[in-house]
């Protein structure tokens, strides 16, 4: 039984109403499992890890496995779309389109459950993309080991592309990210007696200024990186010298090499400031599973060639995005390709008004199913 467009739209609307935060997607996971259990089971094996669902399709040839991953979590956003199928969970919304992601994955899975593939396939319904490096945690759990893909694919919806348009590029699609948390600890005191205190506002200001040299003086200017310090907190009132300064920010880089370089420079600068101001330092640079999504040359060339030459697919080559995606961790372990699916919305990802066009669902299912069928036939393993 291949799921039809009206069924997929109903599934999407059902999922849209029950968004849940990462590793708390219990209702979502149960709903997905209900749909999966309704598909032909002859070649299916299913297992769960926390709120993740792994579905393995036994192909005619069992010495190669193609993977497909979707994320399943929502965001802590209060929905304001006014849709009749708006979120029923207060303060929760599928504001990043993961309801679209899941629905497309179910549509593709339903085809291959009904038409046995040439090679094995593993479908990964992954929790906690937004907040907790769910892909990395699932991979490191070992639950994927027996069904480990030899190559893997995933999509992300794109409000800026027309509904159903496929976008992709060789190289990096999403930047790798790293959170910066720095605290300088000195000594508070009266504003009139600075010599009896150790002013962390000044220390923090020096840190902010020196961080600006990383992009301009340590990184190849041809390569895109961003270091943003978005939070600076120190002091309580104007006549008290602050003994503590908390600074938080983010790193964005299109290669893991540059991400690690920037992390090293941030740490070195923070340690230098602490030494020069004779203060204590607490620093946490947290990347987790948010590696750059660096598409594999082989799988991406095959993907782009298929999409470019398929009459029923509108394809565009896209630029890299400086946003993060935890598929970067999986693709650092398994060669593969991530791509965009256009959903044509005037509102951006993570907006409380995001309302993807539903015609993108079937167009996405058809394009991806067509590619995976073609990929299966072209492989000679």
From Swiss-Prot:
Active site: 71, 130 (proton acceptor)
Top-level taxon: Bacteria
Pathway membership: Amino-acid biosynthesis; L-lysine biosynthesis via DAP pathway; LL-2,6-diaminopimelate from (S)-tetrahydrodipicolinate (acetylase route): step 3/3
GO biological-process terms attached to the record: diaminopimelate biosynthetic process; lysine biosynthetic process via diaminopimelate
Pfam families: M20_dimer, Peptidase_M20
CDD domains the record matches: M20_Acy1_YkuR-like (cd05670)
EC number annotated for this UniProt entry: 3.5.1.47
MF annotations from Gene Ontology: N-acetyldiaminopimelate deacetylase activity
Keywords: Amino-acid biosynthesis, Diaminopimelate biosynthesis, Hydrolase, Lysine biosynthesis
Disulfide cross-links: none
Recorded catalytic activity of this chain's protein: N-acetyl-(2S,6S)-2,6-diaminopimelate + H2O = (2S,6S)-2,6-diaminopimelate + acetate
Name of the top EC class for this enzyme: hydrolase
Record has Amino-acid biosynthesis as a keyword: yes
Functional summary from the UniProt entry: Catalyzes the conversion of N-acetyl-diaminopimelate to diaminopimelate and acetate.
NCBIfam families: amidohydrolases
Protein family: Belongs to the peptidase M20A family. N-acetyldiaminopimelate deacetylase subfamily.
Protein name stated in the entry: N-acetyldiaminopimelate deacetylase
